[in-house]
Amino acid sequence: MAPHDPGSLTTLVPWAAALLLALGVERALALPEICTQCPGSVQNLSKVAFYCKTTRELMLHARCCLNQKGTILGLDLQNCSLEDPGPNFHQAHTTVIIDLQANPLKGDLANTFRGFTQLQTLILPQHVNCPGGINAWNTITSYIDNQICQGQKNLCNNTGDPEMCPENGSCVPDGPGLLQCVCADGFHGYKCMRQGSFSLLMFFGILGATTLSVSILLWATQRRKAKTS
């Protein structure tokens, strides 16, 4: 058996440490921007931390609770001095729980949560209403310093209006208090009345012809102005 060279181990250890550091940095850089929008990390006693620690295969990174695929399931932006959730907020549309308490939020948040169909717990400052109101949540509980919206309702099951969507469309939830009508397979256009696949070739052909016509018109106008000046 060949003698073991201690020098090779000395060389290997720093290399392995550098590799682990590089992988850690790469993972940190791969975090969605919303997770690092606010300095610090998820507070240990927050509901987001409790959800993440009591659900298997979830982990806390910065302000997010992620699964092993990197999908955001929890977001804790409490006490971040936010007047609005910010342009990256929709990166968290897969969340089950969000904490926004202790922020000076302003304006109506109704459309802020469009697409957040999995959201089940939303913690807001006490002065901010739950998006969609009582019709969008099973329970709304107000406390001295926050308001908790719990159990997002499926408005498509609660509207009681079968004529809300056209004949060839169906109702689909689109976030708290929001819904949309989606055309059935094979239908598209206004009120889902057009049948057959949407022709991209025709669309881009019309778009190209229109753009060309406008360009020629502008060019001719500029030449006319140049001649008269």
UniProtKB/Swiss-Prot annotation:
Keywords: Cell membrane, Differentiation, Disulfide bond, EGF-like domain, Glycoprotein, Lysosome, Membrane, Nucleus, Signal, Transmembrane, Transmembrane helix. Induction: Up-regulated by all-trans-retinoic acid (ATRA) in several tumor cell lines. It is a single-pass membrane protein; Multi-pass membrane protein. Glycans are attached at N44, N79, N157, N168. Disulfide bonds join C156-C171, C165-C181, C183-C192. The chain crosses the membrane at residues 200-220. PANTHER family: ALL-TRANS RETINOIC ACID-INDUCED DIFFERENTIATION FACTOR. Interacts with NELL1; the interaction promotes osteoblastic differentiation and mineralization. Interacts with SLC37A3; the interaction is direct and both proteins are mutually dependent for their stability. This is All-trans retinoic acid-induced differentiation factor. It comes from Homo sapiens (Human). The gene is ATRAID.
